[in-house]
Swiss-Prot record:
InterPro entries: Kinase-like_dom_sf (IPR011009), Prot_kinase_dom (IPR000719), Ser/Thr_kinase_AS (IPR008271). One of its GO terms (molecular function) is protein serine kinase activity. It is found in: Host cytoplasm; Host nucleus. Multifunctional serine/threonine kinase that plays a role in several processes including egress of virus particles from the nucleus, modulation of the actin cytoskeleton and inhibition of apoptosis. Phosphorylates UL31 and UL34 homologs, two critical regulators of capsid budding from nucleus to endoplasmic reticulum, thereby facilitating virion egress. Modulates and redistributes host components of the nuclear envelope, including LMNA, emerin/EMD and the nuclear matrix protein MATR3. Phosphorylates envelope glycoprotein B (gB), probably to direct it to the cell surface. ATP binds at residues 108-116, 129. It catalyses: L-seryl-[protein] + ATP = O-phospho-L-seryl-[protein] + ADP + H(+); L-threonyl-[protein] + ATP = O-phospho-L-threonyl-[protein] + ADP + H(+). GO terms for cellular component: host cell cytoplasm; host cell nucleus. It comes from Gallid herpesvirus 2 (strain Chicken/Md5/ATCC VR-987). The lineage of its organism: Viruses, Duplodnaviria, Heunggongvirae, Peploviricota, Herviviricetes. One of its GO terms (biological process) is symbiont-mediated perturbation of host apoptosis. Its EC number is 2.7.11.1. This is Protein kinase US3 homolog. The active site is at residue 218. Phosphorylated by UL13 homolog; this phosphorylation regulates subsequent phosphorylation of UL31 and UL34 homologs by US3. Autophosphorylated. The gene is MDV092.
Amino acid sequence: MSSSPEAETMECGISSSKVHDSKTNTTYGIIHNSINGTDTTLFDTFPDSTDNAEVTGDVDDVKTESSPESQSEDLSPFGNDGNESPETVTDIDAVSAVRMQYNIVSSLSPGSEGYIYVCTKRGDNTKRKVIVKAVTGGKTLGSEIDILKKMSHRSIIRLVHAYRWKSTVCMVMPKYKCDLFTYIDIMGPLPLNQIITIERGLLGALAYIHEKGIIHRDVKTENIFLDKPENVVLGDFGAACKLDEHTDKPKCYGWSGTLETNSPELLALDPYCTKTDIWSAGLVLFEMSVKNITFFGKQVNGSGSQLRSIIRCLQVHPLEFPQNNSTNLCKHFKQYAIQLRHPYAIPQIIRKSGMTMDLEYAIAKMLTFDQEFRPSAQDILMLPLFTKEPADALYTITAAHM
């Protein structure tokens, strides 16, 4: 293969580069490990993949230890396949539970809710890799399992099986090539057609779960998985919650998610609704469009600090705050409002990013500070950005790409 590196970043002995094969017109992302001298190909041209489609099975109640079945859902897209001993990073009970039905290929970093493994099904001659999430010690995946059992959408991670062994509950999920965070890091900023395709899939997933009375509460690039831009799914429903009485009226559902990507109302511990996911999806759209720009600063020292950073970076006008002055946003943060632009005008941090007008308009609408005026996922999907296919978008050059 004749190739030439296009970009490279270094950190702790690990570097990444993007190379292009002129003979096959193929772009690859490669991880280089200078410590052990290994290279790992992250991406090819994303050929049609059937990894997700071929992981089959019915979704029932959580199986007991005597059942040969297990359920599936994707949580972690990309790991160091086979370079780590499972026992070095995990609990022996989790390993035992997983090995009842799966061969462990490698272990991924434990998450806040459990241990995560790359596995193959025992007796499966295809050796197709899946992700198994195991929770031990009395913790439960019941809410996440219950939510995913009711989901059926091409852009939502599919729960195939779940099973219990003693006190350990396991969820089994298709293994995708990468998460969106990794994809952007290697390939970004992305061409406009890919941005639109991925965000359209994300918004479709959000419109679907919101219609079913579910708030995800942790929408971020690390929780979006893909084999190719046309095959993207929203995963990790561990922070998701159900709407009370199936109404989208803002209510107090408690704090959850990630400080860097949470909406203003959630950060302020005000009542919130499905619109909190739209804010987070707006940050995803911005991150795909403009690589290596940190929206609200790198240091997050709590929700108050994050809110002040949001107000400063977006130059939030006093008239953009909620009309209800009894909200925590108004009582504690309106004093930091800035009158440097007209109310609801596109913030300079977006305007100066060199993106198309349709794209900056969509991001600005999704990052509306007051949730009452923030559009729904279905509203955003009706914008021209998503209803019209970009003309030759692969070759659209903006200031952000220069």
